[in-house]
Amino acid sequence: MTKKTKYAGGRRVVGAQILGTRQRVSLQLTSLALLSFLASCVTPKDVQHHVIISVKDQKLALLDRETLIAIYPVSTSKYGLGDWRGSFRTPLGELEIAQKIGGGMPPGTVFKDRIRTGEMVLPNAAGRDPIVTRIIWLRGREPQNANAFGRDIYIHGTPEERNLGLPVSYGCVRMSSNDVIKLYEMVGLGAQVTIVDAPLVEVVPGLANGTQVASIRRGGTFVH
């Protein structure tokens, strides 16, 4: 079988060579388009917000560029502090927001294994204690909390709102549905989360000496 040839600029060019060149150019263009698409999908890390959780106070403070903008009541573990698997304890130290789940879902939406069950639970429903409304999944950044992501340590909504301010969880940080929705909408992936066994006044810049506002207006009420 004789190969077809073409003449370009006085040179003898084999047809198969032209086809191969076109395929390589097409592949390169496809690769560039794919890289551009993937780059557009990357969510910038949230370096603006900082969440500080005080186990001592059972409160969560949200800072925007180191300025306090909100304080919410929370519940940490009834079993105390720690990070070993199966301990049901709340880890200490520096963590970050790894994933956010449940955006747009109505308050009280029940999640099991981070998947909606289709059930809704009202606040303080008798005998019910599922994960509801929003999930903010945390990843540890230090040896003392290296297991946090694998242990499914979340900031999440709880129907047991009457117990907020008390350590009653199984390791996660619980919030009311309304509060976790607000937090979810403000913080992004990669935002710093610090969990401490100390009062907020010792760790929030300026809170102790009054340069930060110690009480934040939230939904018509003050959170102290």
What does each model-identified segment do?
Residues 3-4, 17-18:
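Charged/polar low-complexity intrinsically disordered segments
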Residues 11-12, 22-24:
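Basic polycationic patches enriched in arginine
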Residues 16, 25-28:
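Short, low-complexity intrinsically disordered segments enriched in A/P/G/S/L with frequent Arg
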Residues 38-40:
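C-terminal motif of bacterial Sec signal peptides marking the signal peptidase cleavage site
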Residues 42-80:
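A structural motif detector for short, solvent-exposed N-terminal "entry" segments of globular domains
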Residues 46, 84-89, 105-224:
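Exported/periplasmic cell-wall-interacting domains
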Residues 69, 73-105:
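Electropositive
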